[in-house]
Amino acid sequence: MNLPIRVMIAGIGGASLGTEIRKSLTLAGGYEIYGCDVSKTAYGLYEDDFAETWCVSRDDYVTNVLNVCIESGTGFLIPGGEQPMTLLGAASDTFAAAGIQLLANTPEVIARYSDKDETFRRLAARGIPIPQTAVINTQSDLDQIGLPCIVKPATGSGGSVGVFFAVSPDEAMIYADFIRRTGSVPIAQQYVSDREGEFTIGVLSLPTGQIIGSIALRRVLDAKLSVAYRGRGGLISSGYSQGYIDEFPDLCQQAEQIALAVNSRGPINIQGRVRDGVLLPFEINPRFSASTYLRAMAGFNEVDLLIKYLLHREMPQRPEIQSGWYLRSLTEQFVAKEIVK
């Protein structure tokens, strides 16, 4: 009888990447899943599907996560969000020294492609089609972008946090000033219509750079959960992806070319809209996506595929995709005050 594979997920808040990763591992079977979070009210801390969970302090975060990994005997650690990815990715050697494999892209890819200004400059330099993108310092910077446009922070805008739709130069500068006052660098990006569809595409690469496969979801944008803003001829999607999963070979091939261009060595998620059949990425995240469980339901369980490769060093076969609609909602649970961690 094979022993279960022990995995730690760092970052398990409600409706988060971490809880979606947990569901993907549960679906695959054969895992003993542990979790940790910095918030004592994180949804996942009280989910029964975790073998054990910990509330860890933000202070000396990496050491605290390392300690609970050692305590639980986990061999794999998966960041469950953008901040854990950045912090833990930079310390991947620390975990490797303790015999713990971090399921993430390389520290170099994470550092380069977590900043949108650098991301889109690098993509343009590699000949990848992109929406016009520029840092906003003065109103004249908008000339190369055009209107309407999207204004957002260069870092930390996952789930469409701090993303604005601007129809005039004055409005764009107000949003840019707001972003700057929060300590971030504002960028403007050409607005691309969703007429030909908005897609989220996951590309999974091995540590060698070889691509296992990719999977695309065409987002449904008529549901309230999926829309952060709609009005004045523009639409901004939310962080809750749902929609239709199919092969979409042309778009997946374009996404795989992006993964190769950025030298991806693990999971990467590409969000974009299509114009004249060309995928125009507006967001690239070098990590698993919060739609990873939808992908697992469709047959492409990227978390399980990567772990199995790291264990056995055998190239997995590309799974067959079950085409169809993949929809989601929010769930609730009661936690008695006596058991809050």
How should each PLM-predicted stretch be described?
Residues M1-L103:
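ATP-binding N-terminal substructure of ATP-dependent carboxylate-amine bond-forming enzymes
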Residues G44-L45, V62-V65, A111-D115, G159-G162, ...:
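Short, charged, surface-exposed secondary-structure boundary motifs
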Residues E82-Q83, P107-A111:
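Short histidine/acidic/glycine/proline-rich micro-motifs that form metal-
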Residues I110-R195, S205-Q210:
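Active-site nucleotide/adenylate-binding loops and adjacent lid/helix of ATP-dependent enzymes
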Residues M85-T86, G158-G159, S289, Y293:
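Short glycine-rich, flexible loops that bind phosphorylated cofactors or substrates
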Residues D170, F178, Q190-N263, N285-L311:
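ATP-dependent carboxylate/phosphate-activation module, predominantly the ATP-grasp catalytic core
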Residues I5, A10, S72, Y244-K341:
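ATP-dependent carboxylate activation and anion-phosphoryl transfer catalytic cores
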Residues M8-I9, F76-P79, P131-Q132, I187-Q190, ...:
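Short catalytic-loop micro-motif centered on adjacent basic/acidic residues
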